[in-house]
Amino acid sequence: ADGALTPVTFELIVLENYDLANRLLKFATELPRHASEANKRILLVNLAQSYKFMNKQEQCLSTLSKVDWSACSDDFDLCVTVLKDQFKKAATIMRNIGPSGLIKRHDYIDWPIFKEFRKTSEFETTYTEIFGVEPTELLTQDTTPVSERNE
């Protein structure tokens, strides 16, 4: 069940329907079993980001504190770091991920989790350094809906 909720709740966050996404994600994260540990963590990150975009930073941080993220891959580490507004650390993690990591160049532009990070000079400088193009160029070029991109 939690596997089916992941794309639905992500799309709700993209559409800025944070309240509904939040309710579904609370349900999904409280299920007794999950498809995988990675899927459970994706749901927790999405729940935390729904709280963040509802201006409930305390609940965002509380959600993130429910699991130990220290042994996670860089992609999870980046998401958690961005949700905590630790943008200098996030830029370092971006460099570690590089141009061919799990998070692709369009993901940095499209994923709602990076919304606040994209507004920083750390993001613009690091993105340009990694991908050789300014992120603003991508923002103006691609009009394909996020859910239809494969890159």
Language-model segments: residues:
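Alpha-helical protein-protein interaction modules
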Residues: 2-121, 129-151
